[in-house]
Regions:
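Structural register within alpha-helical repeat arrays
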Residues: 57, 64, 124, 163, ...
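N-terminal leader/linker segments that initiate helical-solenoid repeat arrays
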Residues: 13-123, 130-140, 154-158
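Generic helix N-cap/helix-start motif at coil->alpha-helix transitions
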Residues: 49-54, 113-122, 152-162, 175, ...
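Residue at a conserved register position within TPR or TPR-like alpha-solenoid repeats
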Residues: 61, 128-129, 160, 167, ...
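Conserved structural position within tetratricopeptide repeats
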Residues: 107-110, 147, 185, 227, ...
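Alpha-solenoid helical repeat scaffolds
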Residues: 103-106, 143, 181, 220, ...
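Structural motif corresponding to the intra-repeat A-B loop/turn of tetratricopeptide repeats
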Residues: 131-132, 170, 205, 209, ...
Length: 236
């Protein structure tokens, strides 16, 4: 990590003509009050019983798929390619079982509680990403997770970070930066990787800027975020 940060820092320094003010472009962090709120144990929200039964089956299907994937990984390690390939069909069947449970809930969405909907959107986004390679659909479902009034706070914060990563992967750098900034404002614990990601996002954003001034400002923000990542890594 430290070697990578040093390379990034050196590279970023070469891209700017002057060293920016130390705090320039660094994100606002969560307040002590917000961190306390996130870490305070609250009464767990409860899904409607019929929804909970379906979601449990979704979780069981994901567990099954995960076990099969691990078996497949071990078979590949042992160079048993034929047996490993056969696992693809089993994984596909397990995923299809989980997706079927979600699909059966969708016609009822409008009548469900907000918390119920948030969990359905969350698991659908997981299927979109992990098994279906449907990034636009995953983004759409994560946005719905964020927008639901009764979404669990920690799940909403997690969704901010995932949305940032997904938008960046789709070259929507403005949205990626915006969701990362939201994440920083709400995250109880910030690691160097998050600053590296924000720094990379600003570098990419700089390449899209038509104004030289805006491009330079984005590069300065990138430099400071990578430098902050190095500070945190060195402090460990």
């Amino acid at each position: 990590m430290r070697v990578l940060l040093l390379i990034l820092l050196t590279f970023s320094f070469n891209l700017i003509t002057e060293v920016p003010e130390p705090s320039y472009g660094l994100p606002e962090l969560a307040s002590e009050e917000r961190i306390k709120e996130l870490n305070t144990k609250k009464r767990a929200k409860v899904m409607t019983q019929s929804v909970a039964r379906k979601v449990q089956k979704v979780i069981e299907a994901l567990d099954e798929a995960s076990i099969l994937e691990e078996e497949q990984r071990l078979l590949k390690k042992e160079k048993k390619e034929k047996e490993a390939k056969a696992k693809d069909a089993e994984i596909k069947r397990a995923v299809a079982k989980g997706q079927k449970e979600l699909d059966e809930l969708k016609p009822r969405m409008a009548s469900l509680k907000s918390y119920d909907r948030s969990m359905i959107y969350y698991y659908q986004s997981y299927f979109n990403l992990a098994y279906q390679n449907k990034i636009p659909e995953a983004i759409s479902n994560y946005l719905k997770v964020v927008d639901e009034e009764d979404t669990n706070d920690k799940l909403r914060v997690e969704a901010y970070y995932v949305l940032a990563q997904l938008y960046l992967s789709e070259s929507n750098f403005d949205a990626g930066v915006n969701y990362l900034i939201k994440w920083f404002k709400n995250a109880p614990d910030v690691k160097p990787d998050a600053y590296v990601l924000l720094g990379q996002a600003y570098y990419l954003l700089a390449d899209q800027e038509k104004s030289k001034t805006k491009a330079l400002n984005s590069k300065k923000k990138a430099f400071n975020n990578v430098r902050q990542a190095k500070r945190l890594a060195d402090a460990v």
